[in-house]
Amino acid sequence: MSYNYVVTAQKPTAVNGCVTGHFTSAEDLNLLIAKNTRLEIYVVTAEGLRPVKEVGMYGKIAVMELFRPKGESKDLLFILTAKYNACILEYKQSGESIDIITRAHGNVQDRIGRPSETGIIGIIDPECRMIGLRLYDGLFKVIPLDRDNKELKAFNIRLEELHVIDVKFLYGCQAPTICFVYQDPQGRHVKTYEVSLREKEFNKGPWKQENVEAEASMVIAVPEPFGGAIIIGQESITYHNGDKYLAIAPPIIKQSTIVCHNRVDPNGSRYLLGDMEGRLFMLLLEKEEQMDGTVTLKDLRVELLGETSIAECLTYLDNGVVFVGSRLGDSQLVKLNVDSNEQGSYVVAMETFTNLGPIVDMCVVDLERQGQGQLVTCSGAFKEGSLRIIRNGIGIHEHASIDLPGIKGLWPLRSDPNRETDDTLVLSFVGQTRVLMLNGEEVEETELMGFVDDQQTFFCGNVAHQQLIQITSASVRLVSQEPKALVSEWKEPQAKNISVASCNSSQVVVAVGRALYYLQIHPQELRQISHTEMEHEVACLDITPLGDSNGLSPLCAIGLWTDISARILKLPSFELLHKEMLGGEIIPRSILMTTFESSHYLLCALGDGALFYFGLNIETGLLSDRKKVTLGTQPTVLRTFRSLSTTNVFACSDRPTVIYSSNHKLVFSNVNLKEVNYMCPLNSDGYPDSLALANNSTLTIGTIDEIQKLHIRTVPLYESPRKICYQEVSQCFGVLSSRIEVQDTSGGTTALRPSASTQALSSSVSSSKLFSSSTAPHETSFGEEVEVHNLLIIDQHTFEVLHAHQFLQNEYALSLVSCKLGKDPNTYFIVGTAMVYPEEAEPKQGRIVVFQYSDGKLQTVAEKEVKGAVYSMVEFNGKLLASINSTVRLYEWTTEKELRTECNHYNNIMALYLKTKGDFILVGDLMRSVLLLAYKPMEGNFEEIARDFNPNWMSAVEILDDDNFLGAENAFNLFVCQKDSAATTDEERQHLQEVGLFHLGEFVNVFCHGSLVMQNLGETSTPTQGSVLFGTVNGMIGLVTSLSESWYNLLLDMQNRLNKVIKSVGKIEHSFWRSFHTERKTEPATGFIDGDLIESFLDISRPKMQEVVANLQYDDGSGMKREATADDLIKVVEELTRIH
């Protein structure tokens, strides 16, 4: 068996649908957004969208409509999922708790029936008498809306018109009436039918219209007074209502296809239309009042408003604000203005919502050499195409920044005796000290009486007896707060300079070379208590009081030069309690005693970014449990701060890190800043609960996230990225992308808009000796769109496009790899292409092109003609492995820098995906699932080891380990196949057994090994092995990791118990949702744990947790089973949340 845990690292971000109405209350205007399986509910306010609730559905949302039956005070929500679960939901709020109640539910799937090519359509009669569904060809399904029907019952009505394009209910009809566009061999037509609930039949409709435009694709039902319907085509817009027929063909809409629409006014006089290029139009219906007072339609008019993201759905909110939901790019809130701007646009973007979808390819790189992967994705398409850089970390939100180079330390002060909050920030520089006064959000430079400003400060702070202290290189100065004046000063007897110092509210320890002095702070007096000599110079020291020692520290921690040791000394005697040799030659730069979750620790950071941490016994001063992590490459400065009433440590370096404790384990979390040299906590009136941070040039004040999460940076390309790889030697990414150009009158083509490939710093164009350009069998015609493919070289630091290489006409770039070949020391970018002509069923020729990028130039080193499309390439033991149409081929790299075929494997339909491990090759086929090959180096050929004989249409594959292979297929499922080496017969050995099945509900485009969290930092007890990330069409990022059998069984038990306790929205069974489901079979999920469900344990109430753990057997690592407590499981689940 294979045991795996699958969990969401980033929820889907592509918007599939949106509706607006009064769902949370009759007064609230709501926006509801569907993102595949997730439903987000917002209230529209004057300030923008306010999130109310997010609901995870056990299903892909296919239909989402608000409606208000008679007798209801607010709207209800109808949802239909892709697995045909229908439900009617209501919003209920009591106090703080919000519930989404399932008023009615049922499954409306038919045993037989051919699912319609145009997808699922769901509509609701304007009078709320029924819901209509078009799920299968030739059938119209009706759900009557009775008052108190808990179960949704449906019946079918036969439709003679098999191929329905779109259907709507009409307004103002006595009986519910549908209007639809359908296609038959003669063309497309519009027809209406009345639906009789009693006879469960169609009656003849009020009107029909034969032979409408051949591309007519959308029906818009128009409310009264007009009534009737608008039909949207590729070139024309027509209005029908039986008596009246009006058609317009505005040239402006011909350029692209209109894909979505939304009514602006309740009376239907204005509609928004969005097309595939992201253009937004207004359709206006002009009225004419007749003598008898009736209103008829006088004219239709279309106006171009401007450009938005490419819309999947539009919804008009209020006051000229429109929500543009996008699947191919970021969604937007836009404002429609009365007057146009200089570019002639009436549209202004107000807010943008990040969307990673569709993730076409991605790679994990550790750009900052930090042991933490960043994910770089090829996201979006057409003008919305971009790269997204995704990393996990703690965010700092900048509130103010001041240009101040050279800061060497900073401290907050409360300058007045009775202040609760900080009002001053003291900054130290080489040879000087500056004081900033904080007044609200204003910052101004000031002077503090009693402080010196011509020396570098080592420490500054509020101390006991309403006093301030300033420790400089020359002396320790005690200053009274009221009035501000120097009351006591301590200098080293020979007036030597102080080199390091530490201070708490009533104690000071300073080091002068090898000497240590201990002072106590009394009212208006610094009293020297003791001093001692160490055998080496003191590099760092700390006297933070721990435990309940009344603010006094009985211990002093120091780090020494020369012998590179950390020591714990007793105060006041300076008696040595513990000496820890750190080893190596790098001196300790910062030392800190701190308490996390009531455990005491000593942290010691060295000058090379390494950090040692120990358990500290505050009674004896002994250190235990020595551990080491690497946090950066430069000297690290440790400072504590409090956030959410817990202690955290901020490690300042070239790779700032926050250290905190969870389940008595230290967690090291990246901060999304490039570099921090010094920091201090700041809690002022204008900047409450903030941090002040200094780097080489700037002082920043900001607040910190409570938890670590994914941070996403966008690099717009304005064209479609297809493939990405990283090349360390040149510090670049290679990206394959395509832009759309349009054929002009001269026979050439022009780009639609500037994009990455047209704006690169330098460019080149393929000229191939292999294909003469005249042999192209396909001539393009004027106005036709053509794809132009490029290899982009992108700088890893600035993400600037350094070079764009354009491929041949009709040449599609399909695969990309960066690797070394044979004994050749150079690293190459290698691209696989296909010559694509519309009249060919599959490509008959293509190229493999080897490029080298160095010193800012891209050179073509070699090219190889192949008889087909190069779908996939990987480096394989110093050779190049490629899949070309149905062939898997291995090339070796000769000393003449040419690719020479070594061996082939032919037994595939279309080999789309390749992954390798050692001498094993996993091949993913278009329709024949996966196949395992082994390369025999001695014979120089491939041997077919085993294959999965189930017909899975693959979308991505990955090797989990030597025996387990992960696949994703086109019905949104994951499966794991296992090689059965122990089988007795050859035939059994040749079968890959499907040992894991799971319905993900997402279309996976790419798998890759890697992790988004810091690797090997701190300790973990979760027994997960390996980490495979995946990216999907909806912009979801997920993770698959392997479990041991005992952990799998525990989590499976927990999963089953959670299903009994957590009520699903829409009353859909979890087991039904996660069951592996294709057109040919449905099987229960097995071998996979649903991590999203497991993690929801942390969100349920304590009593529900108790319900889950009742009688659950749990092995806490001692080998003995006992009954689990809620806290045991909280620990387990918190550990699991940390893997993503």
Curated annotation (Swiss-Prot):
Pathway, per record: Protein modification; protein ubiquitination
Phenotypic consequence of residue 537 to A: Slightly impairs interaction with CUL4A
Region (Interaction with CDT1 and CUL4A): 771-1140
Compartments reported by the entry: Cytoplasm; Nucleus
Keyword Repeat: yes
Effect caused by changing residue 953 to A: Impairs interaction with AMBRA1, ERCC8, DCAF5 and DCAF11
Residue numbers carrying Phosphothreonine: 1125
Post-translational modification, as annotated: Phosphorylated by ABL1.
Region described as WD repeat beta-propeller B: 392-708
GO cellular component terms given for this protein: chromosome, telomeric region; Cul4-RING E3 ubiquitin ligase complex; Cul4A-RING E3 ubiquitin ligase complex; Cul4B-RING E3 ubiquitin ligase complex; cytoplasm; extracellular exosome; extracellular space; nucleolus
Phenotype when changing residue 561 to A: Strongly impairs interaction with CUL4A
Gene3D superfamilies for the chain: 1.10.150.910, YVTN repeat-like/Quinoprotein amine dehydrogenase (2.130.10.10)
Presence of the UniProt keyword Electron transport in the record: no
SUPFAM superfamilies (alphabetical): WD40 repeat-like
GO function term, MF aspect, one: protein-containing complex binding
Disease implication from the record: White-Kernohan syndrome: An autosomal dominant disorder characterized by global developmental delay, variably impaired intellectual development, hypotonia, and characteristic facial features. Some patients may have genitourinary and skeletal abnormalities.
Subunit: Component of the UV-DDB complex which includes DDB1 and DDB2; the heterodimer dimerizes to give rise to a heterotetramer when bound to damaged DNA. The UV-DDB complex interacts with monoubiquitinated histone H2A and binds to XPC via the DDB2 subunit. Component of numerous DCX (DDB1-CUL4-X-box) E3 ubiquitin-protein ligase complexes which consist of a core of DDB1, CUL4A or CUL4B and RBX1. DDB1 may recruit specific substrate targeting subunits to the DCX complex. (Microbial infection) Interacts with Simian virus 5 protein V.
Matches recorded under PANTHER family: DNA REPAIR/RNA PROCESSING CPSF FAMILY
Comment on protein domains: The core of the protein consists of three WD40 beta-propeller domains.
Function summary: Protein, which is both involved in DNA repair and protein ubiquitination, as part of the UV-DDB complex and DCX (DDB1-CUL4-X-box) complexes, respectively. Core component of the UV-DDB complex (UV-damaged DNA-binding protein complex), a complex that recognizes UV-induced DNA damage and recruit proteins of the nucleotide excision repair pathway (the NER pathway) to initiate DNA repair. The UV-DDB complex preferentially binds to cyclobutane pyrimidine dimers (CPD), 6-4 photoproducts (6-4 PP), apurinic sites and short mismatches.
Entry similarity comment: Belongs to the DDB1 family.
Designated name of the protein: DNA damage-binding protein 1
Organism, as annotated: Homo sapiens
Taxonomic lineage: Eukaryota, Metazoa, Chordata, Craniata, Vertebrata
